[in-house]
Every structure is written in structure tokens, then in C-alpha cells.
């Protein structure tokens, strides 16, 4: 693994929009603007002020005033919403005499700061995915999201190597705990951002990964020697500089090996000028971390603090607490000669260059003439589906089976009893439960008060730990009752699977698991992670993610347990199988129209391609105005029974006796002795070219007269009768009558004619062969191993509730009632609901499993 990443570092040399690489026209314009600026304007360019689009008009006017009066160079957009941000930026651009450089913390997209925006996976998830191409694609998607809301510089990626599991502020914001991983993914994300006209910012130099404290609240101390810093913390930053990163953010840290005085690194000339500028020859922007943070704000007052930051070598002073005081302090220092105006010109020129190579000038000009919201939205349309694609791919690639697992993976045997227990933040784990049930329906329990008897009575225990991953630096951990429950479950000796939907450092708080166990880290707790996790458990997808961090006895960084797919049906997205979403969207409108005009009250539709369900929806109601259709609800499959119950039996037999298809029905069942049907060749019957009639309305013989009806039917459930519907039973001897009628029916040559009748005969043949009723054989041999629990004959007898079954018909010719819960086909109903040609019920999900089994060739 380490070798592979080292190779990646040597070959990742893509064209970058290098900082300072200008056309002659751009260079002339920058010099021209700089030559006309007053000292006040130049000083103002150093400030990047906080702007909140969720605050009121007074705040907006205050920031506008700073733009007009102090000529601030930019703003860092904080909390708010995308539309409000664009409206605010339009006002600020109009208030500013020069273009503004707009920055935002957008490590996982604008969702880090803005409501109703797309949240991408965290950097730690990206590190686990271990796919440099995906990381670059993520950078590209992040760039488009930035441009959509008027942002020119994204304060990302985090280049800190998170070697301290208890780090209170970095955590999942880092790509991991190895210099190779952080370097490779950092470079790739920088390329994705800057290759799409958004300036990247590597942070938090000289390295915030090995801290016990949060620099927002205090000045953290890093006890690393210079040699250790060079071997660990500095490696990703140096790699980023060598690959053209546009800016570096300086952290507020106390690192005695660099600055024995205890001065914050953000104010240290030794760190910024001597290392970054002189030793590394970094030409890009150098930006302080926010100056309102306790790690630096208590060191000096506004006015003095900004002077110290400039002396250290910073170009942009981020989030100054008091712009008037800061401006006054800097102006005084420049006019007195304490600070060099020539140096100021060099730094302001770098800021102007940054504006020139991003969309700063374009957005400033647009704001004067057009709606910034309308223009930027139209320029960046169609991105949401691509955002979802790259996020889906990353989360799918990241899922990690911890290397110390011993339980069988994937879970193959489904004819066992399963239980699922949810722990942690249980706000919404419905998707995980629903997709577990798509593979194997099971009992679901919530919380640490789960009855242990239920777990003891099961064969397989699945535990899921969920946490809100809104703040990825948090290290979620088990509480005492959850710890106790997992310990007790582990001691039962069952096959146990723990799926961790949270920051993986929380796994360090788990008890040691005994016996057959496997922990899976999903890193995220969103709908995609919950959709994918069951697929990894049950082998629909291969699992190849790596641990991006050290987890003690649970595994080392770079380790994993690679799990192969066993080709079970997957649930995914159209892009995975080369489909466009547009044709699938038309299914919605077609079904809506069908329901609207009364063609059907509802239905289920499932579309799968290459073993991947890319569309699965339920529509409408069971009856007109009735219960909503759910994905679990059963429909009468009618003639699909032929290929879903009877055909598997013939195929199973054929595997043992390949010449079966050339033999006759009479070779395998005595039902046809003496009739011309005993000479029918099996392959001709299968091909519907045996001459059999299409069907026989057997039921008509039983209702010709009232006396005949009285003979055949009773409303009682008594011995010698089989139920057709509640309060309607028919004599079991009708079976002999039906086969007698079939045996006497006429044959009509070898032309193709679709026929039910051969499948009545196949049922007889198979039941004699297997010495077992067809419904029992196909359930035990085919459906149960497939996990197709909702493929069933006689659903009411097999434990399904009536409201899980969609009615078939209003029968006014024989049963004179709503056909609900029993088979619609008259012949199958007369046989008690089990027949070779009809009788099966299923939902679209389990029918899909059966069809995929055929496509997989078994």
C-alpha cells in the first residue's frame, strides 16, 4: 500500500493553474491597478473580513461600510444560505471600488457553512477510498459548488496528518494519519480545485494533526522536534507547494522547536518567512488562520496583532476582530517606516494576481449589471447529479472491513435467523434497515435496552452505530450502556457484525469482540452510506477501502480486509451501469398518468441492469383510494410463476440429467398414462409447440347447475376440501377431474401456441421427482438461499398479512368477491393455490433477485 502511494506522488504531474502565471494583459492590468492605489487601499487589501448571510441588515451595512471606507480586499463567507450569500455578495461587490476575493471554508462543500447545499464526504472518507482519480474529481466538484455561490478561494484541503486520535478539531477533516496518504490526496484535490479556477488553500501549516487542544479556544502546544516536523507534519505541505498550491493557511500553534519564545506560529517570522518563503520558495498567498481565535487573539490587541502578522510574512489577515483598529495600526507602521511599503506592494500584488486568476473580476463586473444569483446559477447548472456521482463513488470505495475480523464475509447463508440492533444517534436509520430487509428480513431493535433473549434466539447479530456526522472532527464514542450491550452480545458466540456509521476513531471505544466478529467502518451516516452498507454485508459489492488512520489493535493505517462480491443484486445509481436518469424519470410520469386516468390504482417498478437496481419505486394504492403501495407489498405473479417456480425445478433436474428435455412427460409421471399427452416431449412443451390448448376453464364444470355447485363447494373449512377464498372451499377430488379433462383435451399440431396446460403436468412430474410439494421444494431449494422471502405461494398461510397483499380483481363470475390474498387464476385456485402455471406472489424486489440469478447463470 505504501509503495503504491509513493508511486502516485511521483506521477501526479498535471497542468495546474500556477499561482502568478499571468497573461501579458493580466500582468499589465495588475501593475496598472497597483500603481493607482492609495496607501489606505493597499492596507485594506490585506483584510479578509467575516460576512454572515444569515444575519440581519445591520450586519450587511456594517460589512458594506468596511468595503467602502477601508477598501477591504475580501470576505470570508460564514453561516447562511446560498441565495442569501449571493444577494449579500452582490451588495458587497457594488460597495467595493475593487473586486473582492471571496473565501469560504468548504472542506466538504458549502454545506460546511451554508444550509440547503450539497454535503460531500469528509476528507477521512476520501482517504479511506484511496482513489486519487476520485479525489481529483471531488476537487473539481467542490470548485463548481464554490463558483455557484460566488466563492473564489476554498480554504481546503486540510493537509494536517492526524496522528493524534484525541485531536479535538481535526479528526475526519484530515485525509488520514500517514504522510503518503495526506500528500497524495491533498495534491489531487488541489489539482481538482485549481484546474477549475478556484484557488486552493493548504491548511493548517506547520501542522495541527498532533494536538490535544483546539486553537479556536486556546494556543495548542506541539512537542515535535524539527526533524520530526520535517518527516511528518511538513511533508504534505511541501508536496503541495511543489505542485503549485495557490495559498497556505498558517495555524495558531505553540511549537517550541520552531519558536522557543512561545509566539503563535501565525505570528512567527521563523515559520512563515524563513521556512515557507525562503527555504521552500513558496510564491503563493500566505493567509493567517482566523485572527478572532483564542489561539492568537489573546497574544496582542487589534492593531498590534495585525502588524505582528504582517511582520511574520502573512499576505492576508483573515477574520480581523476590529478592522478600524487594525487599519490604523498598519497605516501608522507603514507611514513611520516600521513596516516597508515596498513589501506591502509585493503582497498586495499577490492578492491582485489571485483575483485576476480566479473569477473575482468577472463576479465584480457581473454584479454591476446583472443578478449574481441568476448568472452564477446558470453558469453552473447540472452539477448536482455529478456531485452525487462522485460522492457515491467515494463512499462506495471507502467502506472498510477492519483487518482483525474473523466472521465470514460476505454473509452467504440466508436461511438463518437474523437480528439488527441500532445504537447511537437514532434520528434516522430507516434506509439501513430497509436495505437490510431487501436481503434478509429480520427483527429490528433500537437502543441499549434491546432484549438479550431476542439476540440469543438468533443466529446472526448485526449492530449498527449511528452518529450525526455534521461535525466530522468529533470523535463519537459508545456510552456505558452501549459498551455493556456490545460486550454481552459478543460473549454469546454468535456471528456478529458491527457497522460503524461515524468517525472511525469512535471504534477505539468499543470493547474487544470475541468469537466470530467483523467491524465495518462506513465513515459517513448519510443515505448513501446506509444504502451501501447492507450490500457490503451480503456480498452484492466488493469491499476494498483501507483504514486511513491508526486504530490500535483494530488495525493499522493502510490495512483492510478485502471482501469479494458474490454477485447478489446491488442497489445503486444509473451512472454505474451507463444509463441516463432522464428515461427513468419518464417512468414516474407514465405511472402518474396511468393512475390519474384510472388505468391502475398503483404498482411497483424495478429496473436493474448488469446486476444493479437503478430504479425502484412504489406508486399509488392497493385499490382506488386504498392503502399506499409499499416496496414490501405482494402482487399475484400469475403466469410469471411458470419461469419462477416450475422452470427452476426443471433446470435443477436438468443439471443432474441433461437428456431430460428429450424425454416425454409419460416417462416421469403416471398422471397421463393411456393418453396422447404421455408422449409429449418436454422440450416441446417448454417451447409451447406441443399442440396443447391454451387453457381449460375447469371451474365452469363445477358451476353448471345449482346442484353441481352444491356438490363441489362448501363455505366451511373442512377435511376433503381446499380453500379458494374465505367461506368458499372446493372438494380436493377436483384435481383428478381437472387432469382427466386435460388428458382428454385435443392436440393441434406443432405450431407455437402459448399454453398453461403443460405446466400443470410439469408440477405433477416435479412433485413425483422430488417427493415434495412444489411450493415447499422451490422455497427450500431456491427462494430461501436467495433471500427471496417474499416469493411465495399461498401468502396468507405462510404468515403474510392481508394488508401486505395487493388485491387482484373484483370477481363477478365465479368467486363473486374481491380476489385478495389468494391466487386469481381459477385453475390454480382449484388446486389450493399451488400450481405449476400460476399461484406465486412476490414483490418486485424478490422477483428481481430471481431474474438476476438467471442472468448470473445460477
What label would you give each PLM region?
Residues 1-23:
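Bacterial Sec-dependent N-terminal signal peptides
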Residues 21-66, 278, 300-580:
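Preference for extracellular/luminal or secreted protein segments
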Residues 38, 59, 75, 83-100, ...:
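Second-shell residues forming the walls of enzyme active-site clefts
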Residues 65-82, 165-166, 241-262, 460-473:
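Short acidic, glycine-rich surface-loop motifs adjacent to enzyme active sites
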Residues 170-171, 257-258, 378-380, 571-573, ...:
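Flexible glycine/proline-enriched surface loops and loop-helix/loop-strand junctions
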Residues 577-637, 658-663, 667, 825:
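Short, conserved catalytic-motif segment at the N-terminal edge
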Residues 677-858:
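Short, surface-exposed loop or secondary-structure junction motifs
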